[in-house]
Amino acid sequence: KRKCGLCKYRCCSGG
């Protein structure tokens, strides 16, 4: 599950 909270690119991408 990828949850985008504060980061919109690194969190979504898996960063």
From Swiss-Prot:
Modification after translation (UniProt): Contains 4 disulfide bonds.
One cellular component term from this protein's GO annotations in UniProt: extracellular region
Molecular function terms, GO-annotated: potassium channel regulator activity; toxin activity
Tissue: Expressed by the venom gland.
Domain of life of the native organism: Eukaryota
Subcellular location: Secreted
Keywords: Disulfide bond, Ion channel impairing toxin, Neurotoxin, Potassium channel impairing toxin, Secreted, Toxin, Voltage-gated potassium channel impairing toxin
Family, per entry: Belongs to the short scorpion toxin superfamily. Potassium channel inhibitor family.
Function: May block voltage-gated potassium channels (Kv).
The protein's name in its UniProt record: Peptide 2900
